[in-house]
């Protein structure tokens, strides 16, 4: 299967690891390399694309600023180092993007923020607004409070979850290696790059090694796990070398990398993920007009809802049924059960009056809705 081209993608997440961002010998940011990467991002941004960054580096920068000795850190030491490093990391990204007239917006998350649905929706809304304002969200794991993530390193998988949460169509993992090989290239001079992976088979998983360093906690295995998450959620992913300057430009020019392709259209695949992995917590019954609107691709508005059942929170999955009780689809609800009951059957302008807040007009946004046949 032919490799896609970078120009095909509208919303791109770029993951930058600590080993690329921080010079391990000096303990300082690789400023020339980062400026070149920012140039690449600015070019994509100028072309009208949405660009997001998932950046590691807070612990590495913190331990450098605090002049901590080399070697493993205890959990509380990692968290304290991250507290210092996060400030430095935010300033660095603000400066390199600001040089191109682009605002950077910092978002700190953990894996829980992408798994607990209310927090998922809040984070996604924030990302969406930053992109609407043409800022570049810079997302980092909140290492000051994370526990398991610090010990085992999950920023590759975090990046994949962020990419699906943001409905990105491409995730770029910049690494110290230019892709996935059929054997460890450091040990086998005959190892061959695998340019395209259209299905993550057991054979693909078997060739994923563990290329680790003191600064970068993830290896190829976590990148393949990230590819599973990304492609299942509708996001293509690629692994490319970040050791060169202008790595995104190199990809655009056809440089060496490994593509992991989604099995279907990204939107379709993401919606299959929503429908297939979440346990419904309630049911909405809608009128015939709303059924027609949903099947035409519209969002579900409160006016079309005639019955609310179950105890659910904002962001939970619910079943949507027609007036004859047949299942129309499933989706992520934008209100909790009590508020949904209060605004059912009401027009969108009434929502603010009833709830006393400027709520979202949709009961379920079409991007969060899977409509059946």
UniProtKB/Swiss-Prot annotation:
Subcellular location, record wording:
Cytoplasm
Catalysed conversion reaction: L-glutamate + ATP = L-glutamyl 5-phosphate + ADP
Instruction: Give the main EC class.
Output: transferase
Binding of ATP occurs at: 15, 175-176
**Which biological pathway?**
Amino-acid biosynthesis; L-proline biosynthesis; L-glutamate 5-semialdehyde from L-glutamate: step 1/2
GO molecular function, a single term: ATP binding
Cross-referenced CDD domains, in alphabetical order? Answer: AAK_G5K_ProB, PUA_G5K
Entry keywords, A to Z: Amino-acid biosynthesis, ATP-binding, Cytoplasm, Kinase, Nucleotide-binding, Proline biosynthesis, Transferase
- Enzyme Commission no: 2.7.2.11
Q: Which residues bind substrate?
A: 56, 143, 155
The protein's matches in Gene3D superfamilies, at most eight in alphabetical order, are given as: Acetylglutamate kinase-like, PUA domain
Query: PROSITE patterns recorded for this chain?
Result: GLUTAMATE_5_KINASE, PUA
Main location, first listed in the record: cytoplasm
Ranges of residues in domain PUA:
281-358
Q: Name one GO biological process term.
A: L-proline biosynthetic process
Q: Which GO terms describe its cellular component?
A: cytosol
Which family is this sequence assigned to? Answer: Belongs to the glutamate 5-kinase family.
Supply the PANTHER family for this chain.
GLUTAMATE 5-KINASE, ISOPENTENYL PHOSPHATE KINASE
**So what does this one do?**
Catalyzes the transfer of a phosphate group to glutamate to form L-glutamate 5-phosphate.
Q: What name does this protein carry?
A: Glutamate 5-kinase
Q: What's the source species for this entry? A: Bradyrhizobium diazoefficiens (strain JCM 10833 / BCRC 13528 / IAM 13628 / NBRC 14792 / USDA 110)
């Amino acid at each position: 299967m032919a490799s896609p081209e970078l120009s095909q993608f509208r919303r791109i997440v770029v993951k930058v690891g600590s080993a690329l961002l921080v010079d391990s010998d000096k303990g300082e940011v690789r400023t020339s390399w980062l400026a070149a990467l920012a140039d690449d991002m600015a070019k994509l941004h100028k072309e009208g694309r949405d660009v997001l960054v998932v950046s590691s580096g807070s612990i590495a920068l913190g331990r450098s600023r605090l002049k901590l000795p080399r070697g493993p850190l205890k959990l509380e030491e990692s968290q304290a180092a991250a507290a210092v490093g996060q400030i430095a990391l935010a300033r660095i990204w603000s400066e390199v993007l600001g040089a191109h007239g682009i605002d950077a917006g910092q978002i700190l998350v953990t894996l829980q923020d992408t798994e607990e649905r209310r927090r998922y929706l809040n984070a996604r809304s924030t990302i969406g607004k930053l992109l609407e304002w043409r800022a570049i969200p810079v997302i980092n794991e909140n290492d000051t409070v994370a526990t398991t993530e610090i010990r085992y390193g999950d920023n590759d998988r975090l990046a994949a979850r962020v990419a699906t949460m943001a409905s990105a169509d491409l995730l770029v993992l910049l690494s110290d290696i230019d892709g996935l090989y059929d054997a460890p290239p450091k040990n086998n001079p005959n190892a061959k790059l695998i340019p395209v992976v259209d299905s993550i088979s057991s054979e693909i998983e078997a060739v994923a090694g563990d290329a680790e360093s003191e600064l970068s906690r993830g290896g190829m295995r976590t990148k393949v796990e990230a590819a599973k998450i990304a492609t299942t959620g509708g996001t293509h992913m690629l692994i490319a070398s970040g050791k060169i300057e202008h790595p995104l430009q190199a990809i655009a020019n056809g440089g060496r990398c490994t593509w992991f392709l989604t099995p279907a259209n990204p939107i379709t695949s993401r919606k299959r993920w929503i429908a297939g992995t979440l346990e419904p917590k309630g049911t909405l019954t809608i009128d015939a007009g709303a059924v027609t609107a949903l099947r035409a691709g519209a969002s579900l508005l409160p006016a079309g809802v005639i019955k609310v059942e179950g105890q659910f929170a904002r962001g939970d999955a619910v079943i949507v049924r027609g007036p004859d009780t047949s299942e129309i689809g499933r989706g992520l609800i934008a209100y909790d059960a009590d508020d949904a009951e209060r605004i059912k059957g009401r027009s969108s302008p009434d929502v603010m009056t009833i709830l006393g807040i400027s709520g979202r007009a949709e009961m379920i946004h079409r991007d969060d809705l899977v409509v059946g046949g």
